[in-house]
Amino acid sequence: MTLVLGIDSSTQSTKALLVDAADGTVVASRSAPHPPGTEVDPRTWLAAYDDATEGLLERAEAIAVGGQQHGLVALGDDGEPVRDALLWNDTRSADAARTLVDEMGGPDACAAAVGSVLVASFTASKLRWVRDHEPETAARVRQVLLPHDYVSRHASAPGTAPFTDRGDASGTGYFATAAGEWRPDLAAAALGHDVALPRVAPAGSVAAHSAAGRVVAPGTGDNMGAALGLGLLPGDVLVSIGTSGVASAVTATPVADGTGSVTGFADAQDGFLPLVATVNAARILAHQARWLGVDLDTLSDLALASVPGAHGVTLLPYYGGE
């Protein structure tokens, strides 16, 4: 039996699944929580990884990490974080996003360059926020990683150069999604100086090895991982309700929507993942269930029993900004 270890480093926790590679049977699983909030010390993810993989790692022949998208992990000369990570759902960078879009020539030009119109969640927007509000910190940044990159580095042998994949990279705002390559000029424009970016490992490649010699795969972002894991095919639509709400599909051609309604990501293979999202999802359902005094299953039943438009009731679900 060949066992592989899948890691989900999400907003709220690290989950580890030990799986039989032949048929997908889950052999064992563990999890460990992450700190709350939208600004956290990324080193806590490494501690959660160590906790969640205890007793599983030594049984696996290969490892892959999926992670929350967009988060800014800014490293200094020593390879350590210069500040806490700003997560995807930290919306303080909304003004910075609008500024960057203007500097790129407007929404259409921005979407043509990187596949998406930048919003607060994108990594580039967070870089500009740090530049504007913490210039001394910005000056210390030498390399920028995403959460999944940072955890993958930890899973690899000491000294391994950081790596990412095209799917997660497409959510930064400085990756040309259609061409499949970094735009280091856009990262420098956001931060104010040149910065090192991780190697983009090809899909299906051996990105690295662990200290014990286990294969470490490129991994990907959480939305790309979900589409891959569910075997999404052209014509399928995936709807996911978690901390965020997402509807996505896979296509063979890139998307560049200048209205900003559709985000034009790459997927975890050689295709693309057009996606619409909200940062307000499960919290809205949980709040409405509490307000009505019912559980989530009953809330779903009530929604199905209603009519489109809910008899004219309108809810603006922007509890955490957007």
Range-by-range predicted roles:
Residues M1-D84, A112, A212-P218:
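N-terminal glycine/serine-rich phosphate-binding loop of ATP-dependent small-molecule kinases
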Residues L5-G6, A94, V101-V114, F122, ...:
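Active-site core segments that coordinate phosphate-bearing ligands/cofactors
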Residues S10, P36, Q69, G76, ...:
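Acidic, glycine-rich active-site loops and adjacent beta-strand->loop/helix elements
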Residues G24, I63, D90, V130, ...:
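Residue-level signal for inorganic ion chemistry
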Residues R30-H34, A201-A211, G320-E322:
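Short, intrinsically disordered, charge-balanced linker/junction segments flanking boundaries
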Residues E39, A96-T99, Y174, S210:
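Short, charged, surface-exposed secondary-structure boundary motifs
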Residues Y49-A62, H133-A138, P184-D194:
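Phosphate/pyrophosphate-binding loops at sites that engage ATP/ADP/AMP, CoA/4′-phosphopantetheine
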Residues L57-N89, A113-T123, H148, S152-A176, ...:
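Short beta-strand-loop/turn "lid" adjacent to the catalytic site in phosphate-handling enzymes
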